[in-house]
């Protein structure tokens, strides 16, 4: 009765109006699962391949019909007959069927859509919530959210090099309260921006994209919003930055060229100067987490940054690790970064995603489950965050349904868990010594 009988993919749209995949899996019993695949804007060089059609006459070349066909005509016939509960077996079978190191033949988007749909169908078959199916009986930790309320870099047209300015309500007693705090700060920030005559349009991830006078202006405005909402910066609510440094690193000159986003007169920094600048920000503001502070291929820079700041701030590898255990293992061995960002579509299966989270935890690194800038209404990452007791999630601002869908799912899970639910707040930053 738990045998897979049908697999079907279709092309749908993501939050940017670009095509992506939706996959459905059915079993003999009638159990059903559906998975939708996200897409990134600032993508790591070593990410698994997102298969696009390349036909400029259709969706500007971004169509996903090839990936859809790979699901319907190649993957389906290989996994029909599998027990839907055999997640690892199905994921490994698809990896073998693809046969490339980066899933470039079938497409990570095709494989991931099936992987998610299989897990959801198995949960449906067993009549349990997805987080419970994936995580087992000890599933209980609600993640501390990193809420991206200012969008810069490749996520907006704002002239700021850093891609995300986040609030982290680590002082809240529950996830529900953390979400409330975040929403109140978001609205306080909007009011402040309006009073300054700045734009309140939002970027890809639901955060505002105003024309600030540089990074410090952005951080200080967020601090004012935290205080205006009635909270204490550095006690109730902390700040996080996603530098997305690979987006403005000049590999030929070996410099971090802020002029790419901030225009003429902006800083151009060496690796050493970039580290000095990040340390200056950490010493000046209540920053608890920095993502991709160095370029994805600047291993010496990452090691130096970690040696300098690794005890007092979370240093998250996104483009640096691309949710890949091979890169994470190297980072652990070389003491580079102290945290990994987890994006399911960077690697392409749930099995490999869980492997990366487990490896990080065993090494004392934190794992931050994350959305992509091109999202859908699929809320699987909320269930993954709870299933793995990861402790942290990054899923955008307090606007746009593609972001709110994940927050609302976490509210449901917290309700379902009842008294068992734990919100660890600052304790979820167990990689820090301060």
Curated annotation (Swiss-Prot):
Binding residues annotated for (2R)-2-phosphoglycerate, in chain numbering: 163, 343, 372-373, 394
Taxonomic classification: Bacteria, Bacillati, Bacillota, Bacilli, Lactobacillales
Pathway membership: Carbohydrate degradation; glycolysis; pyruvate from D-glyceraldehyde 3-phosphate: step 4/5
InterPro entries: Enolase, Enolase-like_C_sf, Enolase-like_N, Enolase_C, Enolase_CS, Enolase_N
Cofactor(s) the record lists: Mg(2+)
E.C. code: 4.2.1.11
HAMAP family per record: Enolase (MF_00318)
Family from the record: Belongs to the enolase family.
GO biological process: glycolytic process
Keyword Metal-binding: yes
Binding site for Mg(2+): 242, 291, 318
Active site per UniProt: 205, 343
Cofactor note: Binds a second Mg(2+) ion via substrate during catalysis.
UniProt keyword terms in alphabetical order: Cytoplasm, Glycolysis, Lyase, Magnesium, Metal-binding, Secreted
Cellular compartments annotated: Cytoplasm; Secreted; Cell surface
Protein name stated in the entry: Enolase
Catalytic activity: (2R)-2-phosphoglycerate = phosphoenolpyruvate + H2O
GO terms, molecular function: magnesium ion binding; phosphopyruvate hydratase activity
One matching Pfam family: Enolase_C
GO cellular component term of the entry, any: peptidoglycan-based cell wall
